[in-house]
Amino acid sequence: MHRLRIAVFSDVSVAGSEWQWVALDSANCVLAQGQGDPGQWAQTRDVEVLLPASRLVYRQLTMPAASRRQLSKILPFALEDEQLTPPDGSHLAAGVLQGDSVAVAMVARDYLLHLLRRLAEFSIQPRRVVSVLDCLPSDRQDIWHVLLM
């Protein structure tokens, strides 16, 4: 199975000409790569989009046990002071609860919708949208990563 990975590096626009893409085979070997329209690779079923780190906000929250069942309802308000936009203007994604802690990623809904519309113009329907930071190894505590912007 092939996979298409598209990186959006521009923080200003989501114009197709500013995308870097790579098509990978099942062993993660590069089949093709380029910039802008991925052509035939746009029809790939497994599409992942990498957003610029500056477009997301990450937070680690402590959630009371009673609130866990209503996580999706209370997250927007738990992060209200730190959001990029008002609660109804953000898209939130919560990670797996680990004890009483949960990781949350936020992105402005307008930006995400605009990007998805631009991708649809190329017949691209991503299965995943993640930050470029999510691609860094996180299993080692003795390594630091620096992102230059």
Please state what every model-predicted region is:
Residues 1-149:
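Hydrophobic/aromatic-enriched cytosolic interaction surfaces used to assemble or bind macromolecules
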